[in-house]
């Protein structure tokens, strides 16, 4: 995957526009989780250090496109950046006709979704973004799967379009896990529905030596083995797809499970064999024997890709399966990459972030990359690198 990298360029005196992912939760005008901004800081600092005239922009939330709405303003992000950076930081509201920015300064360009045509990858808007800079830096992996004006269109028209350090690292880590993985390669796919992850499962079944399934997805596989799953979340119409996947790839289906008669945080967990699920029960976690068997598989892996918990880990009574898996990944010597919102929440809960080789910042983009799809923003950077 050949793209121009920001780290290979001399940015001194250049107008640099960084498309970051600063889409953070905000409450009462304050940033409540700064993980994405923290991840973007080294890119911004590197450009400032080189003496560039730095602009950074992002989307935040889902405002009505083309309308300013203070609720979705990047002002809380600007306040946060002012605390963290020694350089001057300001917010520009109207910037499409030009921005005054000095070397060593940072101007945050207001929420891109306030601009009409952003989501449709409008050519006029893309050219306006491109005219603001000498170098465009795409550093928002989380939006790389969307062809929008600030992620894709601008890269087409900017004098130079390159990948920022975050995006470069993300692509390298995913390439290491998927293109030429060290074997055995084990993939874990959790989540509620097979239907939303069918392409991912299919794609990984061709790469992985073993494919671990969890959550509601595992219930469809338990049903495919001929067991009743009671009132569990599962997809009867995808049982045949599950059977086909089991023929193609080694999928260790849970042999014991934790069930409850209601979906509730206080419901007591009952541990039982997977062939003994009653009609009024629902599976909410894998059982101890299954968890230990999967931990052993992970212990021997050389590459691990983790997407999704294996149970309803938000409920303390149904947390154990995901905890055992998380600890096994943390203790493994394998190259491990994890991605997806629920996965990141589990990593935080069990405090293992420093034990995972690479944590992906992109939810949808991570899944589309794993599915083998071309990410439009990355494809455009590759295109520009050839010119």
Curated annotation (Swiss-Prot):
Subcellular location: Cytoplasm
Reaction catalysis annotation: (2R)-3-phosphoglycerate + ATP = (2R)-3-phospho-glyceroyl phosphate + ADP
Top class in the EC scheme: transferase
UniProt pathway annotation: Carbohydrate degradation; glycolysis; pyruvate from D-glyceraldehyde 3-phosphate: step 2/5
Superkingdom in the source lineage: Bacteria
Annotated binding of ATP, by residue: 197, 314, 340-343
E.C. number: 2.7.2.3
Keyword Acetylation: no
Positions of substrate binding: 21-23, 36, 59-62, 113, 146
Keyword Thylakoid applies: no
Main localization of the protein described in the UniProt heading: cytoplasm
GO MF: ADP binding; ATP binding; phosphoglycerate kinase activity
GO CC, one annotated term: cytosol
Cleaved signal peptide residues: none
Keywords tagged on the record: ATP-binding, Cytoplasm, Glycolysis, Kinase, Nucleotide-binding, Transferase
One Pfam match: PGK
GO biological process: gluconeogenesis; glycolytic process
Assembly information from the UniProt record: Monomer.
HAMAP family per the UniProt record, alphabetical: Phosphoglyc_kinase
UniProt record similarity statement: Belongs to the phosphoglycerate kinase family.
Protein name in UniProt: Phosphoglycerate kinase
Naturally occurring in which organism (per UniProt): Proteus mirabilis (strain HI4320)
Lineage: Bacteria, Pseudomonadati, Pseudomonadota, Gammaproteobacteria, Enterobacterales
């Amino acid at each position: 995957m050949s793209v121009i990298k920001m780290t290979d360029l001399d940015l001194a005196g250049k107008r640099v526009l960084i498309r970051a992912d600063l889409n953070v939760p905000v409450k009462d005008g304050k940033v409540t989780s700064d993980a994405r901004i923290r991840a973007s800081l080294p890119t911004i600092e590197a450009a400032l250090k080189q003496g560039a005239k730095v602009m950074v922009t992002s989307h935040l939330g889902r405002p009505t496109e083309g309308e300013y709405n203070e609720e979705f303003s990047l002002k809380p992000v600007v306040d946060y950046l002012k605390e963290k950076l020694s350089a001057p930081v300001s917010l520009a509201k109207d910037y499409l006709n030009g921005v005054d920015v000095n070397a060593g300064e940072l101007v945050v360009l207001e929420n891109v979704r306030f601009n009409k045509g952003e989501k449709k990858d409008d050519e006029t808007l893309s050219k306006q973004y491109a005219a603001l800079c000498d170098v465009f830096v795409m550093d928002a992996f989380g939006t790389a799967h969307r062809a929008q004006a600030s992620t894709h269109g601008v890269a087409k028209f900017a004098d130079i379009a390159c990948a920022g350090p975050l995006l470069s690292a993300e692509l390298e880590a995913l390439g290491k896990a998927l293109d030429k993985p060290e074997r055995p390669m084990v993939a874990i796919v959790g989540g509620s529905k097979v239907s939303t992850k069918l392409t991912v499962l299919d794609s990984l079944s061709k790469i992985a030596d073993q494919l671990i399934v969890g959550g509601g997805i595992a219930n469809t596989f338990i049903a495919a083995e001929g067991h009743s799953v009671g009132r569990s979340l599962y997809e009867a119409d995808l049982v045949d797809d599950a059977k086909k996947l089991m023929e193609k790839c080694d999928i260790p289906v849970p042999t014991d499970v934790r069930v409850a008669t209601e979906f509730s945080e206080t419901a007591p967990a009952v541990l039982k064999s997977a062939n003994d699920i009653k009609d009024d029960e629902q599976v909410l976690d894998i059982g101890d024997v299954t968890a230990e068997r999967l931990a052993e598989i992970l212990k021997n892996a050389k590459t691990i890709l983790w997407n999704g918990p294996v149970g309803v880990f938000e409920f303390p009574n149904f947390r154990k399966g995901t905890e055992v898996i998380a600890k096994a990944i943390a203790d493994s010597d394998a190259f491990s990459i994890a991605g997806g919102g629920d996965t990141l929440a589990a990593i935080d809960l069990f405090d293992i972030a420093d034990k995972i080789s690479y944590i992906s910042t992109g939810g949808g983009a991570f899944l589309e990359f794993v599915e083998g799809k071309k990410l439009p923003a990355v494809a455009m950077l590759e295109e520009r690198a050839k010119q």
